[in-house]
């Protein structure tokens, strides 16, 4: 009783009498019940109604005259005669338009069960598909209750003698249905209800003294005794899924809830219960104040007609009374069209319409019953936005009352719906920092925090100096559990001086740049920073060494150089405790790390030498820098032995073949550092023999000048001419070197004698004795050449005379052909045959097979063709000479004409293999052309 009295009472339903429509035409079928002032009068039901039910859009009534009445939503009452005497029980199925009824057609105790198909008509009335006696045996007994399963396969009938019959099969047909006695007892059956759970069907049976359940979907119908007290008629009901389909039994002391196999909770609702219903999550109980034995329900119903009755609507989930009102002589309570309808003995129908959720919530808000409002909203399945609004109002209420701890808990429940800044502004006061911390923690746990929220939360931790909470916040087990922006957290912790926490975040979440910044800029732990870089993957190790390499080189040069060597050769991360190290090694470009070694030449030299040895295919910049470094060391070295060693190293590097493509750069480096041996070596490699010669000339190294000429004179003969000119200008006694040069010039015929004499004439110390031997040898050679030319001329003349005689003989004398063999096949000559004046004879078929022309001898044709080609070439040159002379005379710019002919290769020497008599024509033509060219050029100048 105490618990019941503590339940709050509300008016969540509106009551009004149902009124008749304006007229027969005033309401269309399916229209809402008319209950306003426009109605003419209140609706009045027929008298003598004994039983009621509802479903399929209608209220169904049975009366003492045997009629069944239907009241649809249009409030147009219709009925038909179902029994001859009276109707005692009705059950309207909710999923099928089937009505089951129990009544009497004759006097005595002989109740009949009728099944009506309301969708089919028989003479204007619903079709009765089945009629059978309710009593299974011969002993008369009164039906006390009736229930039907929605699948139409089960129907149970309870009797006052304590028995229960079960109809199994299609209840609408006799031949498909089987009736058997399920239960026998000593107490009247007051309530029945089917409960479906999966494929299992239970039947609850309640009497005045006990509660039981049966499994009717299987064999043997196992029974479970649930309780040893029962209830009166119409004081039991089955709840909806919101209460897990529990069977409700309302006794005078308590209301009990049952599962098929056990008893559930109970509620201390005192008072004599008359009617129990379940409506949309509410328990509806009609009771009266004075206590009457439940057994009197079977003996003296009329004695109750004048009693005052109270209807209470209970919300069992939220533990409040949603409505309570008194009525006179309630016949029954029905639920249809989303409302409750209370039928009273005077024929009136009272409608109880539930208020909308928002109205109910506002009523609770006015009384500051926020917890109850929250529970109500959840039971009414209010959406998350609506719930968040309630949480916010509840939080505001608690905050205004000074209950900040409670307020923040409500604000936490709004996360995801309410803008966080609304809550944060309320708790920014330093005294409420722990509440703000709790809110921000939850915001992060739900992954709804931004960078500003993370910053604020970490600042709260640091102000509270709560290291344990801080560590708990940042030390998550996995990446998926991180509910904050890691980079923001690192920044805040670093700024607050929590370096170890910032390092933990940076290392565990792979923020390598932040980790190195803190180690190098804040903690100055260079060794640890270098170790950390050494265990990173290749790409990240490379980028971080480029970024922080100079700093590390400045403080720990040797260790940094060692890491760079590995990074550029065969890098493998030094990951502790990890067995699956990278299978493929990576290699960085060593040239890109050279700037890191600024102001560290010793480490740079070690790095470059290591790369050149271990990785011969290193970038060219490595070798260029190494050469420059060695030349600098050589130039600044004072110790002779060390300088000699550096000299050898520099020369060795130059001879390594790495500077072929960057010859100019290496040459500039050697010249900048005055490394003469390197300069000369590069000159020689670049075939710059003139520069080598000039170098020795500048340093008056006579023997080296001669050596250069001897070594490279074959490739560049002009070196001897330059050497002769050089020695000729020397006022010193250079006879030995001049003689050596002249010997080579004379042997190779490199210069005309006249030019040699003119060159030596510039030397005032040179005498005729220097070139006497040269001139004598030259004159002797020319004399020999003249003798050979004269001999050749005589031979050409004799040959010419002989040929002329042959030509004359051919013209004047007959030619006798005496050849007996073919000149081609060398077989005996047979007719027909072909003869030529040259003396060759051929078979006709051989001649036709081998000759290119009928007028030419196949044997003489190759030699004749050479002569003809030479003649044509001479004719072309003669024509070209005439054309050249004409253009030269007509042009204002003679030099342009000459240059054009030179460019076209006109003056190139034409070489032909000809007979000796014709050879002398070409030199004369060329000599004449060149002589005319020179003369004309002189006149032009």
From Swiss-Prot:
State the GO CC annotations.
actin filament; autophagosome; clathrin-coated vesicle; CORVET complex; early endosome; endocytic vesicle; late endosome membrane; lysosomal membrane
ZnF regions (RING-type) run across 822-861
Name one process (GO BP) from the record. Answer: autophagy
Q: Which residues carry this modification: Phosphoserine?
A: 813, 924
Point out residues bearing the modification N-acetylalanine: 2
Q: How does it sit in the membrane?
A: Peripheral membrane protein
In residue terms, where are the CHCR repeats? Answer: 411-561, 572-736
Q: Could you tell me the superkingdom of the organism this chain comes from?
A: Eukaryota
**What is the annotated quaternary arrangement, including any partners?**
Core component of at least two putative endosomal tethering complexes, the homotypic fusion and vacuole protein sorting (HOPS) complex and the class C core vacuole/endosome tethering (CORVET) complex. Their common core is composed of the class C Vps proteins VPS11, VPS16, VPS18 and VPS33A, which in HOPS further associates with VPS39 and VPS41 and in CORVET with VPS8 and TGFBRAP1. Interacts with RAB5C. Interacts with TGFBRAP1, MON1B, STX7, STX17, ECPAS, EZR, RDX, MSN. Associates with adaptor protein complex 3 (AP-3) and clathrin:AP-3 complexes. Interacts with PLEKHM1.
Name the family the entry cites. Answer: Belongs to the VPS11 family.
Q: What is this protein called?
A: Vacuolar protein sorting-associated protein 11 homolog
